[in-house]
């Protein structure tokens, strides 16, 4: 199955403590059905000291379930994603809200 949310997409959070906030997807984990979004779902982790890195408490993004995020359409509102086959046989993602192509 083709991925509806991909790396580089601008998404909005639908549920949870970050509801309504937007960010860019920088990693997708299809096996876990999760994604990492820049600036969203920030958690604090205790980092052990290594030769290369100093120890302490660091803040980093935790994975968020794909069902809890949606792509932001051209109008700035969340939209569902569908697929359309073009005349040349190429499969593209389209926004269900507006019908506009996402892969431009």
From Swiss-Prot:
Q: State the source organism's domain of life.
A: Bacteria
Q: GO biological process: any one?
A: translation
Is the keyword rRNA-binding in the record? Answer: yes
Give this protein's Gene Ontology molecular function annotations.
rRNA binding; structural constituent of ribosome
Q: Which PROSITE patterns match?
A: RIBOSOMAL_L24 (PS01108)
Q: List the disulfide bonds.
A: none
Cellular component terms per the entry's GO annotation: ribonucleoprotein complex; ribosome
Q: Which UniProt keywords apply?
A: Ribonucleoprotein, Ribosomal protein, RNA-binding, rRNA-binding
Q: Where is the secretion signal located?
A: none
Asked whether the UniProt record includes Hydrolase among its keywords, one would answer no
Oligomer status and interactors = Part of the 50S ribosomal subunit.
Q: Per its database record, what is this protein's job?
A: One of two assembly initiator proteins, it binds directly to the 5'-end of the 23S rRNA, where it nucleates assembly of the 50S subunit.
Family per record: Belongs to the universal ribosomal protein uL24 family.
What name does UniProt use for this protein? Answer: Large ribosomal subunit protein uL24
Its gene name is rplX
């Amino acid at each position: 199955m083709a991925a509806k949310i991909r790396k580089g997409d601008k998404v909005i959070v639908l549920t949870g403590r970050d509801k309504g906030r937007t960010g860019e997807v920088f990693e997708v984990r299809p096996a876990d059905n999760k994604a990492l979004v820049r600036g969203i779902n920030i958690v604090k982790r205790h980092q052990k000291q290594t030769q290369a890195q100093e120890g302490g408490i660091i803040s980093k993004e935790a994975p968020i379930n794909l069902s809890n995020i949606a792509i932001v359409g051209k109008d700035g509102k969340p939209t569902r994603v569908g697929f359309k086959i073009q005349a040349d046989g190429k499969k593209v993602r389209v926004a269900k809200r507006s019908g506009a192509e996402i892969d431009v």
